[in-house]
Amino acid sequence: MLERLSGQTRLTALLAAPARHSLSPKMHNAAYAKLGLDYAYLAFEVDNSGLAAAVQGMRALGICGANVSMPNKQAIVPLLDELSPAAALAGAVNTVVNTDGKGHLVGHITDGTGAIRSLAEEGVAIKDQIITIAGAGGAGTAIAVQLGLDGAKEIRLFNRKTATFKQAKQVLKGINAKTSALASLQDLADDRAFRRSIAESSIYIDATGVGMKPLEEHSLITDPALIRPDLVVFDLVYHPAETKLLAFAREHGAKKVMNGLGMLLYQGAEAFKLMTGEDMPVAYIRELLCRDKE
């Protein structure tokens, strides 16, 4: 990487805590090298206490873009100059672009577009469909927003009654006001409503994190009757590559089972495009990530 750095090198970054585990530096720097772009991507350990200073640093240093992850996705919103329509609806940001290089910072959310591009890659259409999502955290609500913007018929979100539940209610109000979709939020503890919703949906998305460590032996769906030959099951977890849910859905004849690797790649590709104006070489990056996991 050092031989690529110059006095003209443009800096992109990750603002997160923790940041060390992220695959984003590997993805973006590999893409820069592949395309011969004079950019470098660094991960910075930044939590809410240092976020305002980090954003000022972006302006002062002319950092051309940054990815934003936990715990900063919502906290960064009031620090920016402008939001994309999806970010405004979601009330959260995962990508910031310094649009003029002079400090005008625009926030975007690419989780939803990443998920929908991943579905499209597998031939799964979302227009006019009923979709159930378990988990109303940042990823779940971002996907709900993009589903609404892209023409889903109904979006049924389920979550435990925590602080996240209250926040998600506000997001869904925006979806109902700004899109043609009918968005609803119900308690994940209401098993009857959850089962009925899955039975009426063509796509089930699990955005809870159940299935990754330390919950790798768990699944929200354990009844074979909920798995139908016309149901797509999409788990946002990508490590392990096949969660308990996906193995169960495959075994019992789901139409299609998908993990979160495609979403990871495509949300990164959307951010890459926003920050550089270039298309990320997705096939190359996918191969690189899969090879590293072997």
Curated annotation (Swiss-Prot):
Binding sites annotated in the UniProt record for shikimate: S22, L23, S24, S69, N94, D111, Y238
Q: What Pfam families does this protein's entry cite?
A: SDH_C, Shikimate_dh_N
Give the domain of life. Bacteria
Kindly state which keywords UniProt assigns to this record, in alphabetical order: Amino-acid biosynthesis, Aromatic amino acid biosynthesis, NADP, Oxidoreductase
What pathway does the annotation place this protein in?
Metabolic intermediate biosynthesis; chorismate biosynthesis; chorismate from D-erythrose 4-phosphate and phosphoenolpyruvate: step 4/7
Could you say which residues bind NADP(+) here?
Answer: G135, A136, G137, G138, A139, L236, G260
Q: Which SUPFAM superfamilies match?
A: Aminoacid dehydrogenase-like, N-terminal domain (SSF53223), NAD(P)-binding Rossmann-fold domains (SSF51735)
Q: What does this protein do?
A: Involved in the biosynthesis of the chorismate, which leads to the biosynthesis of aromatic amino acids. Catalyzes the reversible NADPH linked reduction of 3-dehydroshikimate (DHSA) to yield shikimate (SA).
Q: What is this protein called?
A: Shikimate dehydrogenase (NADP(+))
**Protein species of origin:** Streptococcus equi subsp. zooepidemicus (strain H70)
Q: Gene of origin? A: aroE
